[in-house]
């Protein structure tokens, strides 16, 4: 199965379960992590033909997605004597995808890169759309670029080695898509047998459908708003809260998808308080998140500090915070005129 991301420039295809032989008349630099290298690198190498192949495995996890790791990656790229015709392959989850794309975008002012995601979260979100970057002390993904891959290959077979926690985190991003753009997908999600899904014993077709439907939705959004000036901001549903939570917990307590799950619950509470969402729909999202074992609560110790952290969000402008809300489910909206009092009141509900 193929989905084309039809951009005015740099259009590319996403191949689902179609990873066959990849031939390059250039050097290839594979960026991965030790776990994925141990599980799947042999499979990938059997499919690649290139002049030379270099492999770099860096520590994986949001706490390592920083400029220090980026410098380590770039040093290995320079030591490999890559040129502008070389190709970087990001082979891993969302962290590897973000860092690999960023490295490709700044190495000698840009070389081609391909994403081969190995987590559900990366398949449904991080690997498609061209957002790259790293975190710093001020927040998440505040240093980065928009830089599109030349192709994306999503293989459902790689997902079979994921833990239930990793699969659930990926499902959170799929739920996000449904809540923003197509609430009928929520009905599909409710019918999934969570036990076989979380054990990765479900049929490959389930993974394929999740990946395909996510990418079809996201590609349409990116085609209309590549640089996130409007519509694409809806893909950040739950993320305004999630990024603060991740930063406050040093990126160690929650997987990204888990933080997004909590963020969606918080965003829904704000939408509920403002009258954009009703209790039944808010509860529906909670029930689906709980179905897959995702967290739905976070204790805010300092409301004022949490509120101030919102202003480091990339969607904030002119001293206003742009919140992405569901209202109703399947129809996202962006609100930049919510009073501080209303925001604080919602945050106090999570103390």
Curated annotation (Swiss-Prot):
Reactions that this protein is recorded to catalyse: 7-phospho-2-dehydro-3-deoxy-D-arabino-heptonate = 3-dehydroquinate + phosphate
Keywords: Amino-acid biosynthesis, Aromatic amino acid biosynthesis, Cobalt, Cytoplasm, Lyase, Metal-binding, NAD, Nucleotide-binding, Zinc
A Gene Ontology BP annotation from the UniProt entry: amino acid biosynthetic process
Compartment(s): Cytoplasm
Cofactor: record remark: Binds 1 divalent metal cation per subunit. Can use either Co(2+) or Zn(2+).
GO (cellular component) term, any one: cytoplasm
HAMAP family found in the cross-reference section: DHQ_synthase
Family: Belongs to the sugar phosphate cyclases superfamily. Dehydroquinate synthase family.
Protein name stated in the entry: 3-dehydroquinate synthase
Organism of derivation: Campylobacter jejuni subsp. jejuni serotype O:6 (strain 81116 / NCTC 11828)
